[in-house]
Amino acid sequence: MYELLESINSPEDLRRLDRKELHELARQLRAFLINSVAQTGGHLSSNLGVVELTIALHYVFNTPEDRVVWDVGHQTYPHKILTGRRKDMGNLRRPGGIAGFPRRDESIYDTFGTGHSSTSISAALGMAVAAQKTGSDRHSIAVIGDGAMTAGMAFEALNNAGAMDANILVILNDNDMSISPNVGALTNYLAKLLSGPLYTTVRRSGEKVLGVVPPVREFAKRAEEHVKGMVTPGTLFEEFGFNYIGPIDGHDIDVLITTLRNIRELKGPQFLHIATQKGHGYQPAEDNPGKFHGVGKFDPSNGCSIAQAGKKTYTQVFSDWLVDMAARDERLVGITPAMCDGSGLNAFAEQFPDRFFDVGIAEQHALTFAAGMACDGLKPVVAIYSTFLQRAYDQFIHDIALQNLPVMFAIDRAGLVGADGPTHAGSFDLSYLRCIPNIIIMAPSDENECRQMLYTAYLHDGPSAVRYPRGGGPGATITRDMQLLPIGKGELRRQGSWVAILAFGSMLAPALEAAETLDATVANMRFVKPLDANLINQLASSHTLIVTVEENAVMGGAGAAVMECMQAADIHTPVLCLGLPDMFIEHGVHETMLAECGLNAAGIIAAIEKKLTK
């Protein structure tokens, strides 16, 4: 079934094939991808869309000497398969297996580690300048999607690269879809570029490159006038100083190879625009590329998920609350940076389209945009993953907290995220947020508490954040009523002796389980900022050991805040802080990862017993 594919263990093997064999290789590679991801889960649509491009890049360029940087990196499965990792795909994103994103420590062909968007042009430019400075003639290539091109960092890099004489090739993979449909003026510009009339002025270098390449016609059901197209020297990318070439059919291997070979001979900044289709070659993914962007196990014969019925996720709890709250308060507006589905805003967007704002992959803009809304009477709710909030830290401080604006943050994927690994882990938000003045931070221990915290945060007259983990909680009954929680107050959940465990958020359940063995007192702290100082001081004064447990980096996290609180009160009871260690934690199964970090009941018991025996 995969006879030709199984003969490819490196790009050197690939380069020995003739053009006819490359077409068969693409067919086998696509079939292998579908069947492999069906068994492991992972990203599918984006990978099916770059099969031909990946083959062409490794066929034309001398990788790994020539550097290829993949933006975001979720579309690198074909790249991994063709660079000696085909046999490892069965353990994709599993403990001890290969990562779902490029890793420099995994392969010499992974030239730059990615996971977040819009970094590829900057990295490839740095590599191009390094080649220039060391006298190397190697090529540097950045592959970036149209969704990632909406981020400001991509344009900062284009602006810098166009002014240099470095040999960099930027390939815009235009599939008209990131995770959520792309938005804004740039996307409209690209759409017009693809569907506009034939221009009569053609740049000589573009003519040289395209040469005998046939025009793109009716590709991916685009408009009839879709591109016979070259572009004038006045286009956006040429204004940045690039030689623009395209758009060309990104699923035509022959066109890709001819074009890339010609570009390889050119000097200076080059920009190749290719048109592709997410999910190409697999009908279920073509019909619903969003569903197959990140997918669990499924039946490859029909694309149907092999899903187990589970508890309501925290994302769904937020989604339900947002719709309910929006019905009560017409000032509420929802904002997301290109994560409508993942952050649970679909229902809100459908019911309140005029109050929903997907700003694209532009986290910095999202926060300041929300700040402007808050200045003039709206009540913005920013739904964002913990890992992506990191990209807008200055905006959080300067534009929101400094002005004490009532912007609410629903921080999803807080803590470990399982198979997506360290690039997507929400390990640091408590550490980097709690030092900011004016903010309140809450961490729910169950689904119903999450709903009440969202309500409390929304009513707060200042910056607020509710951070919750990926997946489901313990299965608490969710009440329709919304109740205002007292700011900065925790609750005593179990009275014991000697040891008091202060649990934050998702760690309450394992803390209570551990307490049964230890006969420990357990407090559900609820608030990371402001802390319940009275409760902390009371427990510290009546117990011989205080233990803090959190699903956040132990350095600078909630435990550190508790120690600061006790120090301020001149209380010297010993404190044991449990949390995520000072390291990037590899991908795996969430429950197993927590156990390895000592954050399950057994780990908590072991850590406390070890402390008590010293």
Swiss-Prot record:
**Binding sites annotated in the UniProt record for thiamine diphosphate:** H74, G115, H116, S117, G147, A148, N175, Y282, E363
Q: What is this protein called?
A: 1-deoxy-D-xylulose-5-phosphate synthase
Record EC number:
2.2.1.7
Organism of derivation: Methylobacillus flagellatus (strain ATCC 51484 / DSM 6875 / VKM B-1610 / KT)
Reactions listed under catalytic activity? D-glyceraldehyde 3-phosphate + pyruvate + H(+) = 1-deoxy-D-xylulose 5-phosphate + CO2
Give the keywords, sorted: Isoprene biosynthesis, Magnesium, Metal-binding, Thiamine biosynthesis, Thiamine pyrophosphate, Transferase
Q: Which Pfam families match?
A: DXP_synthase_N, Transket_pyr, Transketolase_C
Q: Could you tell me what this protein does?
A: Catalyzes the acyloin condensation reaction between C atoms 2 and 3 of pyruvate and glyceraldehyde 3-phosphate to yield 1-deoxy-D-xylulose-5-phosphate (DXP).
What the entry lists under Gene3D superfamilies is as follows: 3.40.50.920, 3.40.50.970
